[in-house]
Regions:
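Residues immediately C-terminal
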Residues: 134-135, 149
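Conserved catalytic/switch belt of AAA+ P-loop NTPases
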Residues: 116, 141-158
């Protein structure tokens, strides 16, 4: 099972898995913790499970046309899971920045200008923002409007 790689976060893993199973996904999450505590691994794990073809509720139908329960965890075998492992999943975006902080231009170019484009191959378009505490005030304000009125398919994960 994929979640065995993440240690000491069972309560968070269960929360994410239950949210996927029940179809109650929020449009934004904050994952907070010390440097080196595995925040990025947890965010990728969640994004991978969200995009996993096995968890896609549209495909969660058996041969008889009956809905089946989605597992809430990533299978690790489907095309989307393999793309996520190689960091090539087109609907999971990792926000990057070159300066000492995340400026308004990075937020506008990498999130705000991109978020209205529907997902390419998955049910969600997921943005992972590492070190989000390094956003300038202007970047925070630019992101705030997007978080307040996101498209239904968008999920933003802030790591601090």
């Amino acid at each position: 099972m994929e979640s065995e790689r993440i240690l000491g976060q069972n309560h968070i893993l269960r929360h994410f898995e239950n949210a996927i199973r029940m179809g109650k996904i929020s449009h934004a999450y904050i994952i907070n913790g010390e440097e080196g505590s595995g925040k990025m691994n947890l965010a990728i794990h969640f994004a991978k499970a969200l995009q996993c073809e096995r968890n896609n509720s549209n495909k969660a139908i058996n041969e008889d046309g009956e809905r089946i329960t989605v597992p809430g965890t990533a299978c690790g075998q489907c095309k989307s899971c393999k793309q996520t492992d190689s960091k090539n999943q087109p609907d999971i975006k990792y926000i990057t920045y070159e300066k000492s902080g995340i400026g308004v231009d990075e937020i506008r170019e990498q999130i705000n200008d991109d978020i209205d484009i529907k997902p390419y191959s998955s049910p969600y378009k997921i943005y992972i923002v590492p070190e989000s505490e390094k956003m300038t005030v202007q970047a925070q304000n630019a992101l705030l409007k997007t978080i307040e009125e996101p498209p239904e398919y968008a999920i933003i994960i802030l790591l601090t």
